[in-house]
Amino acid sequence: MPGDLTQSNHLAGLPLGTRGGTLIEHTFPLDAEYSFRIRVRGAAIGLAAANLQGEELEVSLDGERIKLVPATATIDVKLAMKAGPHALGVTFVRKPPPGADDVWQVFAANSGVQSVAITGPLAPTALGDTPSRRRIFICHPRSPADETPASAKASAGSRRSSLESDASEGGCAKRILSAVARRAFRQPVTDADIQTLLEFFETGQKAGGFDAGIEQGLARVLVDPRFVFRLEREPANTIDGKPYRVSDLELASRLSFFLWSSIPDDTLLDVAVKGTLHEPAVLEQQTRRMLADPKARALVTNFGGQWLYLRELKNARPEAAGFTENLRQSMRRETEMLLESIVREDRSVLDLLNADYTFVDETLAKHYGMPNVRGSRFRRVAVTDEARRGLLGQGSFLLVTSVANRTSPVSRGKWVLENLMGVPPPLPPPNVPAIDESPEAAKASSLRQKMEIHRGNPTCAACHRIMDPIGFTLENFDWVGRWRTRDGSAPIDATSQLFDGTPLDGPVSLRKALLARSDVFVRTATEKLMTYGTGRALKYYDMPVVRNVVRDAAKNDYRFSSLVLGIVKSDPFQMKMKTVGSKQQ
């Protein structure tokens, strides 16, 4: 666990009356004994391990206390575990020093869990019953004779009726491998496919029995190019440079990896096999079903990480008193939860700019100056400070667009131009000096004055006169997102104007200016979402499609589902261009 992660507060999911530690969701493969090595650091601010004296560590399993042990630098625990998913908790019993209160407790040294290593299974007693095993072993041989496949008699492409009869004739292995291969290859499997898998099964079966045979068959599935790659085959007689429509099975894969970052489920595959997925009504029904599925959380994490630079948060190393790994994680979680609420509740994407609510825990609420929020649990709260509404007031954006010890109006302006307005500035010319390298800049009392000196260079002015005014409106937020009224000894001047002359005087006016051009923001969001969904950069010929999606979404208040449906029904999502000189696969 990160060294600057403070562990003085209760962690959601762990017993009350504890602090810090970790909660690990782990699937144990077999019924067996497992070894757990817990390493504990002496204190969050570098004190020796001797400070662990008197501390107690609670180990819990699925919410029930298993052990209570004195905290030492290294703790070894062995537990007999049943196979399957379990929640392992390792946390400290809260023991505040006499007279301590919340104001001063933050400065007190406290120990923390550094790592938990799980080793095992040791001397397994049974195979156990895990969710993955239940999904794979959809049948079990009734006798040794049933373990041997009855040489592919029926068509392997027919998933249920023929496979049921195969199982009754001793084809349990065939049934298992057929089902797995169909999901893994994202298409019906042929007799030849099954025969190949059964050959691997028989090799493993001879060496170690039925389970070993299935293991070998699965290993063959996992190295098949149809599993490793998303293959899309060109139809016969396609013409170079001409678009063609992908098959329903390929469309199903595009849709599932777009919304779930994973393979199609059986429902989607069944529709694709029938050849009806491309029909608008059917495609809309499946898309809405998938957006409502918990697996759509991957869209929030991956698309949000790509579009809003949330993946870059881990690289930020701000020099700011009180900044911890806890705060960094809370900032990312806030933005993800805002985006998730828009996806789950099918809200307008304009709420990303103008939401009058957000999600905070105690750490983030204190950072923002929000009262009456206690504990590590994230909760939805009303935003009463106009400057904090939407993405522009969130710590994730403000941190990732700053440098270690100051804000960066250039980075913030560039981020807004690229991600909210869709007009990225050109790359800077080579060998441009930093803003504070000139003697004149060294004498300036504020960052804004230094920027004005830098902008005096004609080579720099062309881009900076577009980016800097946007960044200046956000100067009341420091480099870790705290509100301020002064930059050093100079008062903050957040007045500026957009490149079209619109006057600005702070984050509220910038947000209102963006909302006044709501179609521009929605178009940019659509471009980002289509880029993510298609897995390629958009071209000039995609722009009419983007404009059509935005125009149609306006009729439904720019709800998130309207953008997704517009994209999945579009030609760029459903079609592909034959590249010149490519060979038929």
Language-model-detected regions and their locations in the chain:
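Low-complexity, glycine/serine/threonine/alanine-rich intrinsically disordered linker
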Residues: 1-585
